Amino acid sequence: FLAKRQFKAINVTIPYKKLVMEYCSYIDPRAKAIGAVNTVVNKNGLLYGYNTDYMGFAHLCDAHGVNFAGRTVLILGTGGTHNTTSAVARDKGAAKVLTVSRHPDPEKGELSYAEAVSSGAQIVVNTTPAGMYPNVGVCNLDVAAMPGLEAVVDVVYNPDKTELILRAEEAGVPVAVGGLEMLVAQAVYAAEYFLDRKFEDAPVEIRRITAALRRDMLNIALIGMPSSGKTTLGRMLAKSLGRTFVDLDEEIVKADGRSIPDIFAAEGEDGFRTKETAETQRFGKEGRQLISCGGGIVKKPENLRALHQNGVILFIDRPVDALAVGG
């Protein structure tokens, strides 16, 4: 395909970002330094290679106020994206860039995750697939034990907030951001190469597209007291917005084969809540859903985390005197 060159421009993804360089007549100096090309343009039979992942990551950090100057930066992972993010950090004046690996090579100066906690880093960048859909909820770094952190950036974009980002938010890290905007930005900058023209206000357009994607992709979860109208409103909203409607209580019954009163009678509230958490975690990592939650879902923090990772949570605040009583 590359040898025939019967295309005008292409995007290249893993695992071909290095291999494609062999076919390029010209490689942008930045892409050459990183050792990866993700954008190839055919100019009169000659292939020109660029790396817009660099531009995308730089945009993400600039847009969210990540200041690398004089900082110690931890980069989690040793794959291809490590080189890209490391190049951005160094170009923006990082004082030190440290690599963290599950299997560190001391000769390369790599750190274990345990060692990383006491590194004194101000910025953490995750380039590993840890926490990526469908294996959500994974986080290998104890950010709560790193009080000097100023920013945590995760290039993973699905879910919207990985476990690393959720923990960073809980720890009060000033900037905690996932990778969706980086994905959009690299595509916009690749399009500039494809079309051979600069887009006016590209950063503004990137933010607009990212916001639109997030609105379209994220779940809407409804919480509130029993009989507050979550199911009724949920069905109406799902139909109006073109989303899949999920009633978690109904899903618990489907999965277990017993009614909710029967589950309570046989296993008590603890047994029911365990099943509720399992269903919340199952649906919470998906997208474009309208989720109606049981009244007691707020009793377990892990339920709210599961809903928060890929959605917004709305509280239906119906007046107490309007709620049903009994049964």
What are these regions (language model features)?
Residues 1-64, 159, 165-167, 171, ...:
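Phosphate/diphosphate ligand-binding glycine-rich loop within oxidoreductases
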